[in-house]
Amino acid sequence: MKSDYINRDVMGHILFALNPVNRLVCKVALETGLRIGDILEFKTFDIVFKKSFTIREQKTGKSRKITLREPLRKELQDISGTYYVFEHRTDPHKHRARQTVYTDIKRVCKLFKVKENISPHSIRKLYAVDMYKKTGDMSKVQKALLHDNELTTMLYALSDILHSKKR
């Protein structure tokens, strides 16, 4: 089942109720548009010692340069583990699992009786919608999401409209 779009107000309520570390993962996703799996692989060294760093996306294998706003970078530094920013609960040599973030989001959605199918990927759609509204330029959104196909980008950037028509 595909993840649904969710507006910023509802997302704000969901973020508020998440576990603090999972909330921070989602805040990074809202700022960067990255997939959760890519965020969970952030290395402590990169966050502490670099203003910008490059990641290789798991799904596409494409490289992307990341620059975080200083307040968010500081939050990440404060929770950083020995090797990964988002350390695994029992093994510091592993990062937190994607399933952990997913399960927490599902828990909160159930608590708030959210009918839409919200998942971490819904945040990527919200990022695309916000960027498209801000810039009005589909090619900028496509570049930010590293999509090869503009039609794929349109599904993300216009997901608010598609969601409202579905209702």
Residue ranges, per PLM feature:
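Basic, Lys/Arg- and aromatic-enriched nucleic-acid-binding interface segment
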Residues: 4-32, 36
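Conserved tyrosine-mediated DNA breakage-rejoining catalytic core shared by Y-recombinases
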Residues: 5-8, 32, 41-74
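Short amphipathic helical patch at the helix-1/turn junction of helix-turn-helix
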Residues: 29-31, 132-133, 157
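Active-site-proximal segment of tyrosine recombinases
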Residues: 38-39, 117-118, 128, 136-147
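Short, polar N-cap/turn motifs at the start of nucleic acid-interacting alpha helices
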Residues: 47-50, 137-157, 161-162
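C-terminal catalytic core of Y-nucleophile DNA break-rejoin enzymes
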Residues: 58-77, 83-106
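Active-site His/Glu-centered metal-binding helix of metallohydrolases
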Residues: 123, 127
